[in-house]
Amino acid sequence: MPLIPVVILLAVGLFFIAARSGGTHQPTPGLMAEATLESPSGDRLGTVTFRQTATGVLIMAEMEGLSPGGHALIVHEVGSCTPDFNAAGDHFNPEDAEHGFIHPAWKRGEGTRGHGGDLPNIYAASDGSARADFFTVGFTLDQGPRHSIFDADGSAIIVHEKPDAYGEEESDTGNRVACGIIRPA
């Protein structure tokens, strides 16, 4: 095969890969955001801090007043916390990906790793406290890219009553027990 068609084919392929992965966006290290978590009755339950790095977002969560055991922690698509937290909408999912860290399509190398807002479960101790630090590439704190949590209607972080099963189908994570609007810090 002549060299020019191969180069054109590679360029077109790289274009589609870049378009699917959010383009050529370079994150701005050092950007910060924070969400204060509140219960449906307005009690303060904790704080989630977000720090942009060159390769993703570091998330640091500290909570209290939760029921002991596992809880799904998920970024939702709208920055609104109404008394029942339903105004926060669905999971943040700018890539229109299938649900779950262990979705069969993702394990086959097809598509992206679940919803951008899907995070690891947190586990509350017997006294209701929970602390977790983890990293995600599912979203950015930069404004503008498609996978930014700071789009026109913002984003919220929700603590659910039960843990996420991480599977192909969205699991029954129960009621939304805490919500915080994510704001630039």
Question: Where is each model-derived feature located?
Answer:
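N-terminal leader/targeting pre-sequences
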Residues: 2-9, 13-70, 75-185
